[in-house]
Amino acid sequence: MHQFTTWTGTTVPLMNDNIDTDQLLPKQFLKLIDKKGFGKYLLYAWRYLDDNYTDNPDFILNQPEYQGASILISGDNFGAGSSREHAAWALADYGFKVIIAGSFGDIHYNNDLNNGILPIIQPKEVRDQLAQLGPDQEITVDLADQLIRTPFGECPFDIEQDWKHKLLNGLDDIGITLQYQDLIAEYEDNRPSYWQN
């Protein structure tokens, strides 16, 4: 996993409530197993007019001024539904580094974190202000200080300290385990003989 300390980027508002994982990444794309390439299918039914990938010009992610936005502002209950990790893969592959919503589906929240995306919960009034920013206005998310720095001020956010440690140090579950490699080896060496090969 890549280290996440601060991120500065532009925002795109998609303020719908209850955007579920099936909307984020429809089931027909779940047979793919490589984490790369899913960005093309993110919000497929909303982004495209047909199966030939004709852009829906009215959909915000297809509007030129929002190309390259890396911070998604959304409504309540983002990522509800099934536990498909592919939805987080699609968000990451599209280029989103931060999702700011009113709440998250529990499993999707963890899937985002496991894939290096920082999910942040903010009240509606903050999200509404963020949604009013122009497409060229940047905000900075500072994980160490747990602050969102915006043109209208700073907004604090909460994150579990274990997740914060993992993101700041670029560690996934395997990376955490490897930090204890010497202790694991010592334990294995000191096991009773009947537990050893």
Curated annotation (Swiss-Prot):
Pathway: Amino-acid biosynthesis; L-leucine biosynthesis; L-leucine from 3-methyl-2-oxobutanoate: step 2/4. Its EC number is 4.2.1.33. GO terms for biological process: L-leucine biosynthetic process. One of its GO terms (molecular function) is 3-isopropylmalate dehydratase activity. InterPro entries: 3-IsopropMal_deHydase_ssu, Aconitase/3IPM_dehydase_swvl, AconitaseA/IPMdHydase_ssu_swvl, IPMI_Swivel, LeuD. Pfam families: Aconitase_C. It catalyses: (2R,3S)-3-isopropylmalate = (2S)-2-isopropylmalate. Heterodimer of LeuC and LeuD. PANTHER family: 3-ISOPROPYLMALATE DEHYDRATASE SMALL SUBUNIT, 3-ISOPROPYLMALATE DEHYDRATASE SMALL SUBUNIT 2-RELATED-RELATED. Catalyzes the isomerization between 2-isopropylmalate and 3-isopropylmalate, via the formation of 2-isopropylmaleate. Belongs to the LeuD family. LeuD type 1 subfamily. This is 3-isopropylmalate dehydratase small subunit. It comes from Streptococcus suis (strain 05ZYH33). The gene is leuD.
